[in-house]
């Protein structure tokens, strides 16, 4: 599996023109980051153990191919901070929510704002979060949905790249 560079991540996320495709891509990127992180959990690199135990666990049909199961394992082993676990779980849950909707909300919708307001890698960046809040709750004469949507997309992109940096083994 090829390692994603930050430029690859930025290009893939920037190419998405709606929230659904953005979150689908973000979910896929985060799952790939977790898959790349998982082998670092196994301390014994004995060839036989890797071949008969580790590889089947990490296979695409294996139990650790599920982002939620893999996250729980990483967190339970103490290899991930609570805020990071919460952020990735939150991204996964929001993606599953969007996947079940008949009509997908947009970047500027209130449900997306609620999602953003609970992503630690966004809310901990005071400058970014304060700018988003100021624009979200600005006077309608100043507020532009297209501008706000672009800013939300940027914030979510930064959240994904921040999360991936934390997943470096």
UniProtKB/Swiss-Prot annotation:
What is catalysed by this protein?
A: (S)-malate = fumarate + H2O
| InterPro entries linked | MtlR-like, MtlR-like_sf
Q: Does the keyword S-adenosyl-L-methionine apply?
A: no
* UniProt keyword list: Lyase
EC assignment: the record states 4.2.1.2
Kindly report, in one word, the top-level EC class recorded for this enzyme: lyase
What Pfam families does this protein's entry cite? MtlR
Q: Which GO terms describe its molecular function?
A: fumarate hydratase activity
Name the family the entry cites: Belongs to the MtlR/FumE family.
What functional role does this protein have?
A: In vitro catalyzes the addition of water to fumarate, forming malate. Cannot catalyze the reverse reaction. Cannot use the cis-isomer maleate as substrate.
- Subunit (UniProt): Homodimer.
Protein name, UniProt field = Fumarase E
Native species of this protein? Shigella flexneri
Taxonomic lineage from the root: Bacteria, Pseudomonadati, Pseudomonadota, Gammaproteobacteria, Enterobacterales
Gene giving rise to this polypeptide: fumE
């Amino acid at each position: 599996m090829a390692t994603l560079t930050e430029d690859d991540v930025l290009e893939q996320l920037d190419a998405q023109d709606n929230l659904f495709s953005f979150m689908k891509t973000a979910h896929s990127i985060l799952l790939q980051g977790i898959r790349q992180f998982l082998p670092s959990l196994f301390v014994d690199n004995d060839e036989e153990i890797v071949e008969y135990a580790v590889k089947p666990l990490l296979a695409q049909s294996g139990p650790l191919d599920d982002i939620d199961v893999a996250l729980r394992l990483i967190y339970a082993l103490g290899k991930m901070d609570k805020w990071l676990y919460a952020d990735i779980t939150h991204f996964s849950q929001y993606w599953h929510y969007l996947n079940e909707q008949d009509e997908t909300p947009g970047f500027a919708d209130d449900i997306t704002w609620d999602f953003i307001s609970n992503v630690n890698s966004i809310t901990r960046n005071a400058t970014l979060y304060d700018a988003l809040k100021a624009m979200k709750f600005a006077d309608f004469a100043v507020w532009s949905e297209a501008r706000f949507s672009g800013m939300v997309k940027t914030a979510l992109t930064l959240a994904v790249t921040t999360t991936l940096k934390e997943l470096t083994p």
